[in-house]
Each structure stands twice: as C-alpha cells, then as structure tokens.
Amino acid sequence: MRSSVIVAVLVVVALAALLTQGQELKYQEREMVAELAQQIYRVAQAPWAAAVGPHKRNSELINSILGLPKVMNDAGRR
C-alpha cells in the first residue's frame, strides 16, 4: 500500500514538473494538482478508510445478496 502511495506521489510530481516547464499553471491545472494531493494525503493518513468504503451492516449485505437473482431476472426480461 505504501509503495502505491509513493508511486502516486512520483506521478503527481512528474506531472507538475511537465506542466510547469516554461509556463505558469492555469487555474484548472492548479485545482487538479491540489485535488490529487488531497486524495494522496487522505490515503496516506488512513489507507484502510479509502479501501473499505461505506460501512454496511451484515443484514444489508445478506439482503442485497439474496436480492441478486431477482434483479438479474428482471434485467433479463427487459
């Protein structure tokens, strides 16, 4: 997980270096770099939070699994 964060940081640094060669960053580019930096920071602080996603109770998981055949059957009729 740490290696992927390091790779992501290197990619952002490389993109920033390419974009700033001989020119200033435009507003959209600055916004994009800031957004990427925020996402990398969030992953570095709590890597499990990004991977887990929203928490579901066991009953919600069971109900969604039990409802799959009905959803697939309804989709097949369309």
From Swiss-Prot:
Q: Which residues form the signal peptide?
A: 1-22
What residues form the membrane-spanning segments?
A: none
Record's keyword terms, sorted: Amidation, Cleavage on pair of basic residues, Hormone, Neurotransmitter, Secreted, Signal
| GO molecular function list | hormone activity
Query: What organism does the record attribute this protein to?
Result: Callinectes sapidus (Blue crab)
- List locations, semicolon-separated: Secreted
Q: Which residues carry this modification: Alanine amide?
A: 75
Asked whether the keyword Secreted is assigned, the reply is yes
Q: What is this protein called?
A: Pigment-dispersing hormone 1 peptides
Entries under InterPro entries matching the protein: Pigment_DH (IPR009396)
What family does the database annotate? Belongs to the arthropod PDH family.
**What role does this protein play?**
The pigment-dispersing hormone causes the migration of the distal retinal pigment into the proximal end of the pigment chromatophore cells and thus decreases the amount of light entering the retinulas. May also function as a neurotransmitter and/or neuromodulator.
Task: Provide one Gene Ontology biological process annotation.
Answer: chemical synaptic transmission
- Short name of any one Pfam family annotated for the protein: Pigment_DH
One of the record's GO cellular component terms? synapse
Q: In which tissues is it expressed?
A: Eyestalk sinus gland.
Name the gene that codes for it.
PDH1
Q: Please state the protein's primary subcellular location.
A: secreted
Superkingdom classification of source = Eukaryota
